[in-house]
From Swiss-Prot:
Its EC number is 2.1.1.-. It comes from Homo sapiens (Human). CDD domains: AdoMet_MTases. GO terms for biological process: peptidyl-lysine methylation. Pfam families: Methyltransf_31 (PF13847). Changing F218A: No effect on elongation factor 1-alpha. The gene is EEF1AKMT2. The lineage of its organism: Eukaryota, Metazoa, Chordata, Craniata, Vertebrata. The modification Phosphoserine is found at S21. Residues 1-31 are annotated as: Disordered. SUPFAM superfamilies: S-adenosyl-L-methionine-dependent methyltransferases (SSF53335). This is EEF1A lysine methyltransferase 2.
Length: 236
């Protein structure tokens, strides 16, 4: 389950809007926040991959993947560091990590079709050092823990749009993150729904902002800003 757009790839998740009835946090509930939506998306993408070999969308675009990998290289993250991709979708980011030499990487998604698709893509690439699990990050099994790095490219965005008590689901997300990430471990999040300040508030308990990564800027009506927020937190 992942979504968003970043200067060249991916379908944007709609955030706050003047259409529909926003909840108390300002988000309009959407099918984009439901498991049924993502099951249907990845069932279609799996069929397309089987028929045409098309891997589907690169969520947030290739530049977003490269941005995260550059950060990991800059900070000399060991190639055997344990990395968790939360809401891995088609697993393309896992493939890129493996190609850069990372050898202890895991992708989870609550959609079985997403895990099937990512497994097929990984097999086609001839990679064998990637672990995949069907996991709901809000209701984790006891097997996931002790990761050095957790990465989110749109999953927190989608959870924020869930029609069924999204605020509580966001709180559970933070609890799950705290559980799976090692103390002093890093959390890299890319979002098109949340600003830097809002993400700081959402992850204020137990996490500290380490770095804001550069993202594309826009200018409109005399104002400028970032269409995407990309932050690195460290678990305290």
């Amino acid at each position: 389950m992942s979504s968003g757009a970043d200067g060249g790839g991916g379908a944007a998740v709609a955030a706050r809007s003047d259409k529909g009835s926003p909840g108390e946090d300002g988000f309009v509930p959407s099918a984009l926040g439901t498991r049924e939506h993502w099951d249907a998306v990845y069932e279609r993408e799996l069929q397309t991959f089987r028929e045409y070999g098309d891997t589907g969308e690169i969520w947030f675009g290739e530049e977003s993947m490269n941005r995260l990998i550059r950060w990991m290289q800059k900070h000399k993250i060991p190639l055997d560091a344990s990395v968790l991709d939360i809401g891995t979708g088609n697993g393309v980011f896992l493939v890129e990590l493996a190609k850069f030499g990372f050898s202890n990487i895991t992708g989870i998604d609550y959609s079985p079709s997403a895990i099937q698709l990512s497994g097929s893509i990984i097999e086609k690439e001839g990679l064998s050092n990637i672990k995949l699990k069907v996991e709901d990050f809000l209701n984790l099994s006891t097997q996931l823990s002790g990761f050095h790095i957790c990465i989110d490219k749109g999953t927190f965005d989608a959870i924020s749009l869930n029609p069924d008590n999204a605020i509580e689901k966001r709180k559970q997300y933070v609890k799950s993150l705290s559980r799976v990430l090692k103390v002093k471990g890093f959390f890299l999040i890319t979002s098109c729904n949340w600003t830097k300040e809002e993400l700081l508030n959402e992850f204020s308990e137990g996490f500290e902002l380490l770095e804001e990564l550069p993202t594309p800027k826009f200018s409109f009506g005399g104002r400028s800003g970032n269409s995407v927020a990309a932050l690195v937190f460290q678990k305290m």
